[in-house]
Amino acid sequence: QKLNVENIDCRIDGAEIGKHGRAGYIFNSKINGIDEADALLIVGSNPKIEAPVLNARIRKRYLQGNFPIALIGENNNLTYPFNYMGSNSIDIKKLRDKNHETYKILMDAERPMIIVGMGALTNGSGPAILHELRELGELFGVIKKDWNGFNVLHTSAGRTGALDVGCLPSKKGLSAKQIFSESENSNISFIWLIGVDNKEVLNLK
């Protein structure tokens, strides 16, 4: 704002987050929350690659028992068994089916957890997916007075801090994707990259 710049964005990968409160973009339960959770749904994330320490914690919790895990997204080897529900956003709707196994598991859990990754939030359906998962979180008790197991897993280390200080476009400003597009069309002549080495900027000229 002091520089009079409206086109500012820390969401280089296009994730449409940060507009609906801090709880909508942080790992609310912290990594220690894995130890308290009794059911887990992973959406659009491969924690084995994106967060190995977190993945090891999930595996440790699984080995302790009574910790069913479901996955929506790419079907990867995560080092622990899980119920694979599919890879499309439409598969999230299955969680509203009262006869679905994962619905019953999450509904019966005392401290269910959802981990949503950038794989679910960096496409055009990201806002709708996040909204749907928040609603499901409230339905299953993922979000309640004494427990918040709704967690967003970032693939960029500085993203949370940048969102905290408001590195988002103004109402008239352009998003990162729009900035890159306008740059390619020569409508933007200068882009200041601060701590950015994402693949999305490698082809900038």
Could you describe each region identified by the protein language model?
Residues Q1-K205:
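Catalytic alpha/large subunits of respiratory electron-transfer oxidoreductases
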